[in-house]
Design a protein with these regions (language model features):
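Conserved active-site segment immediately N-terminal to the catalytic lysine
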Residues: 1-13, 44-49, 97
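Glycine-rich phosphate-binding loop of ATP-grasp-fold ATP-dependent ligases
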Residues: 12-20
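PLP-dependent aminotransferase class I/II
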Residues: 26-208
Length: 208
């Protein structure tokens, strides 16, 4: 019934944050906007009979997004070019798979280039993976991180993935593991999860 677009800072079109909800009809849109603008009742003062939120995008952020939409095709073409470079450069490297569209029937914008490393692939420095605790945010991520006592968790990328990340970091090339499965996040350890092992495998072998 709804479509969701992300305009986060790392996306093809960004408003510095936030996104958009695509609604099928006016009734749904009005209901969503009611919740997104604090769910106020029709009184000359603030009256709330349901919990509302302040989720509406500011006009400044929306203006940034509208401006970027005029050059969306340029962004897409650039990302496709970057993807083509990775496919060319890694084509002859045994043990590395570049994720790409399965056929010409698909037209990916390649907002994110990802690879998968076979667990048997050896990377220089692999023996030192996870020996040092991370001190700063990884892969261009902003914000403050919470200090930890160990570099190891019960679900983490394979040693060769971490070794390649560190190697690229030292070469000033931004890279990071793919997203950790939600059911493996400690904060959700007691939440129900329906899994088959695929997400864990992708996390252990993937890099973007």
């Amino acid at each position: 019934k709804f479509g969701v677009l992300s305009f986060n800072g790392n996306k093809m079109i960004t408003t510095s944050g936030g996104g958009a909800l695509i609604c099928a009809d006016t009734e749904s849109k009005n209901k969503v906007m009611w919740y997104a603008t604090q769910a106020r009742e029709a009184y000359p003062y603030y009256q709330h009979e349901e919990v509302g939120y302040n989720y509406r995008m500011s006009n400044i952020c929306a203006g940034i997004g509208r401006g970027q939409m005029t050059i969306a095709n340029e962004h897409i073409n650039h990302h496709k070019h970057v993807q083509a470079l990775y496919e060319e450069l890694l084509a002859d490297v045994d043990g590395i798979t570049v994720h790409k569209a399965p056929s010409a029937d698909y037209d990916s914008n390649y907002w994110l280039c990802t690879i998968e490393l076979d667990s048997t692939l050896r990377i220089k420095g692999q023996e030192n993976a996870y020996k040092e605790v991370i001190k700063t945010a990884v892969g261009g991520a902003a914000g403050v991180i919470h200090a930890v006592d160990t570099a190891v968790t019960d679900c983490q990328p394979n040693d060769n993935v971490e070794a390649l990340r560190v190697y690229l970091l030292n070469a000033k090339i931004e890279a990071r593991p793919v997203w950790k499965p939600m059911h493996k996040q400690p904060v959700y350890k007691n939440a129900p999860a329906y899994i088959n092992g695929v997400s864990e495998d992708v996390f252990k072998e993937g890099m973007c």
